[in-house]
Amino acid sequence: MKKRFLVFLSLILLILPISIVFSHEGEENEFMLDHSELYPISQLSAVTYGSILFGILIVIIIFFHKRMNNLTKKIVYFLIAAVASLVTIYLIITTLHLNVISLTKGPVHWHADFEIWVCDEEIKLAKPKSFLSNKQGVNLMHAHDDNRIHVEGVILNNKQSSLGAFFFAIGGSLSADGLKIPTNEGLVSAHDGDLCSEKPAKLYVFVNGNLIDNPAFYVISPYEKVPPGDRIKFVFTEKSIEEINPNIG
């Protein structure tokens, strides 16, 4: 019985790391919005796998404790303590490391209000699909169906708090000559030269009433309240710039 149990436990410990490695193969994140590429596994994965292993060990104790000798019991209890300790230490170390190497030496909480207009129609982002989350986007960069960009967490570089990162986070894209926005009706795509009112249209992006170039690279101002946080307006229209209202609201 002792040998079977130890073989079973060894298989679990061998299979678990292998599954972690394969679960991260092929992952790509243009803006690295979840910091997963910095560490062997993400914090969420560490908690998930640690919880699974912890649960397996608890089940083993519940169903097999009467058949275990003292040495086996000590091994199982040691593994339970080790799993809990290692996960906790991993979370502490990665959190401290992220804060030390971050751009601001700690987490941020910035906001910017926005509107998106395509051919005189205001475009609303697709509502969150997850029952457990009200975020349109990811933890670091998202909206809450409130026309407000939320930057919440640790940023490592300016790129992670750019407008390009926001559009990437919500499942769209932004460039100097166009944008793509996921909506409840599907993906809305508009690029310079597409028609509005049967006339060639162009993308304009205004920040606090001022026209900007290369909007994907624009970094959101570091403020929690709006104003002084940015008020950003995306306008795709056939109208001349003189005919456009550059302000939101």
Language-model features: where?
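Bacterial N-terminal signal peptides
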Residues: 9-17
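Alpha-helical transmembrane segments of integral membrane proteins
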Residues: 6-7, 77
